Amino acid sequence: MNRIFLQFGSGLGPMSRSLPIALALAEARYEIKYLGYDMAKTHMKKAGIEELCSDFGISDIKKGSPNPQWSTADEFWSMIGYGNMPWVERKVDELISLLKEFSPDYILSDLGILACIASRIMGIPLIAINQSCYHPNVKLKWWEDNYKFENYKSEDSLLYKLNAYLKKKGAPQLNTFTEIFTGNLTIIPSFYDFDPIQDVKKYNTHYVGPVLYIPKETASERVLKLF
């Protein structure tokens, strides 16, 4: 039986995209374990998806100084607490220990940055559910003036800090911060015309539209042929 580890970010969006995929994989007899936020636990338990570890949490994360003028993903993720690298390194090391015990064949992440980092270090194939705004090849109009800073490598940038940690672990370096949210397969749950990306071939990126779960017994033959 193939095993999959799932981590998703906070808010309803990542969970609402991840849960249908987890349900379909469970139906296909994959063993799935997840890590998510407290608000998601009731829904995941109801769906029969087991936690990787009930004691693993990120409630002790300390947010950085708020900056309403942030203009890059690097700045935003630093601001919400991931710029604190001693904390990030500790949590990733904890996660790696748990993953060694579970031994997943794949990691599935919807903006679960700790899982993305662990995948890069452990060499476990990553299926990344991403938003176009966190894809390295997107260029949003209101970020255009500061877009070059996405590659900013000062010692204060999260890109620099992550690369220092990845180098220490013998893992591949990042070219941009948002590259951490791409995988062996990168899925955009949207439409190209609505969220265009400059080069979809890079990072093996695929637009799939809204992610929904249809029980196998009620799915049409046309839908089943997709799989």
What are the residue ranges of the model-derived segments?
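Glycosyltransferase specificity loop/lid
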Residues: 1-108, 116-118, 133-136
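Solvent-exposed alpha-helices and their adjacent loops that cap or buttress functional pockets
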Residues: 100, 178-181, 227
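Nucleotide-sugar donor-binding and catalytic loop/hinge architecture
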Residues: 1-2, 202, 214-227
